């Protein structure tokens, strides 16, 4: 009999559901045929088909390959004329299964050649106001001639090779095609004028000081091999100045000749350090190798200032550096440099954290630069893999923020009196963390920056946020007076102004860097925030951190694509995140949710109006309706005051009987006893799918937060209904109480709605 009764109830409930749907169909217009527009559909159309080079799991495939380029270089710096001369031997190894007809070499300095087309692709018209240096550069000065002067391109036997230069790319013709597994050795001789990076901008160049001396930060200074891979073939897109680089790994042996009074460092190990350092400097360096708490000054400010007061040395000396398995090379040189260093323990190895800066950087740089480098190595190694190189250098260069293997340039300078604000201090620490962090992305996890800016900048910005928070915790004096490090990017609320902006000037993250509006927000802020939300709100730290580290370890010293990242994050976590990638990375949709209504219900044993309406519509006799638990809305025709505050089993005898018949006394004692039932309608004016985080505040002041996974939107992308049963009355409901989901309009996130303040009252305040 009990089974029959339950079966009838089930039939009745299904019938009622059908009845409700019929009513909805009458009210809603008929939907025409359409393609699958569900936001939870898989990314099969967007993703390429897995193959032997890149697997469906996101890992490198069984036949994954990458090319290799090894360099031997002799470089000479003419400090007086700020000119650079170079000669290199490149050994290029073809590990691909393809036969190569020619080689492509990158000539990035040609972006600064006199006939460069870079200025001609900007269409902004006349700017309403400009700095004097900018005005002079745009309208008064002749274009700076900073392009490569290619003197020779020779094979290993000294025979000239045919080559063709197209702006920033040079095609080199080989005597015969380069077969799979073979290598080709050739030489290039070149020189170029070094630019003033302070007045003329740029990632490389020199800063001129009032005393007549200069500090050089040198990169993109040599003809560099382009990448050839299974995705792009030759990545030979032109360098226009903003979108960065794609480079193969290799070994660098570089000899750099500079004035004898210069202090130099760069990518790789200094193999003749004993010849370059004084005995005092060498002793200080050896002391720094044993100092894990505080930096040790190797070249003091007094020593640097003394050299700066003297005429520059006419003698020259050659520094020798060697780097294995790096994708690029950068270096810095000046007679005005101060240097300090300390050791950092990472994965059982001692890594040197180094800072190099002119006296103008102090006291800020001696206080915080090397400590920021050390914290970066610890935080990034925890989130990805143990740092594999022997050092990481932070160089102070005015208005700079740029990265190369083991070395980077960073801004942040006190005023002439040595004073600085928190803004300058935190700006310096943040840029150091960011640029040192680039050792991991893209120097080791070697993505194609030219095509996908976000793959290094966005991932790096995310880990930067983690490292900044670690910095505040581990160096509390750095954030004195604050509760936490004031990260500019990472917190969800910080990206809201961008995502709520004019859609005409917002591009999807999955856009080529050169073609994006609001470059910083698009390639840095939004992907960094998306990953922070993914970690904290969608996946949880344990799942996210394992998957993120898996991606990093799979692709260290390799060339990943966006799909390799997306697939690995799902493969290592057992989470279907296609909805997240689509919304955050492939569209410009924004998140906007709101509470449209909240209705309070109580339990009754008496038939409610909804049942009566169905009985009438279906012509169902009363005798056929069993005892049911009815939900009565407060304020409705069915509502009676005596229903309030009572348990369901008190009001519905059939429910009490059911519980007695089907559960033991111990089981009944463990059951909840809700007295209040709430129907909460949540609407989604925004297009972006996100979890619903909802906080309930009860009459006694206690709170409860419930997170509904994003999948709650899978069948209705516009609105959903939540039910909440409680033993206590709810007095307040808030969506996204901690601002975790980048909701662009929080004015509709609270129930009861906050009273609007009149303009008159606002003026009174």
Language-model features: where?
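A surface-exposed beta-strand-loop module
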Residues: 24-34, 74, 83, 93, ...
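Glycine/proline-rich low-complexity spacer/linker segments in large multi-domain proteins
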Residues: 115-130, 191-252, 273, 343, ...
